[in-house]
């Protein structure tokens, strides 16, 4: 699609300035909400940039979102004749207002009680002995746990009652006769 140079410059300038660009998926929209160019031209230019890997595209809820890549930054710097000191807004550190350090502030800000963990009482109260046993090797979960006795033989068949009840028990619901009933 042929895009006038003036509109192409406006789109590129905005994209480089912000580092990101969005557009509603409406090809008939007369003008983009942020830039004074038709929405279709924004979408088509960004599709071209995407194919050259200058931007990364995300589409969600009928909106396109384009994020400038490092290659795109270099391309736009050359295209717009900008010095390397100028960077998109997404790469600038935001200046946060200095926060209060923890525990400082006006003394009447919050009532302060006695210090919480002095030496006169244990830190965790009555939980001192909890998991306080000797530690074993990693993967060893401690305690005197042994294996099953040697004579233990697990059985997964019912001990009488209702043979064939449950999964794989044989018989019932379309299964053929069990092997014990075949004679």
Swiss-Prot record:
Q: Where is this region: Disordered?
A: 91-183
Gene Ontology cellular component? cytosolic small ribosomal subunit
| Biased composition range(s): Gly residues | 131-146, 161-175
Q: Does the keyword Glycosyltransferase apply?
A: no
**Which subcellular locations apply to this protein?**
Cytoplasm
Question: What is the protein name for this chain?
Answer: Small ribosomal subunit protein eS10z
Family, according to the entry, reads as follows:
Belongs to the eukaryotic ribosomal protein eS10 family.
Species name:
Oryza sativa subsp. japonica
Gene3D superfamilies (UniProt xref): Winged helix-like DNA-binding domain superfamily/Winged helix DNA-binding domain
């Amino acid at each position: 699609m042929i895009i006038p140079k003036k509109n192409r410059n406006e789109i590129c300038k905005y994209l480089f300035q912000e580092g990101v660009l969005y557009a509603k998926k409406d090809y008939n929209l007369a003008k983009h909400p942020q830039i004074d160019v038709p929405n279709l031209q924004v979408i088509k230019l960004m599709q071209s940039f995407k194919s050259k890997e200058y931007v990364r595209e995300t589409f969600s809820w009928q909106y396109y979102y384009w994020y400038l890549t490092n290659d795109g930054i270099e391309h736009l710097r050359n295209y717009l004749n900008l010095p390397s000191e100028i960077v998109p807004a997404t790469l600038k550190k935001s200046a946060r207002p200095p926060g209060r350090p923890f525990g400082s502030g006006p003394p009447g800000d919050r009532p302060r009680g006695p210090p919480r963990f002095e030496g006169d009482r244990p830190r965790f109260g009555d939980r001192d002995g909890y998991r306080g046993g000797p530690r074993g090797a990693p993967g060893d979960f401690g305690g005197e746990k042994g294996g099953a006795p040697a004579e233990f033989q697990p059985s997964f068949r019912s001990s009488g009652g209702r043979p064939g009840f449950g999964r794989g028990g044989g018989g019932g619901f379309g299964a053929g006769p069990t092997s014990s009933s075949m004679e």
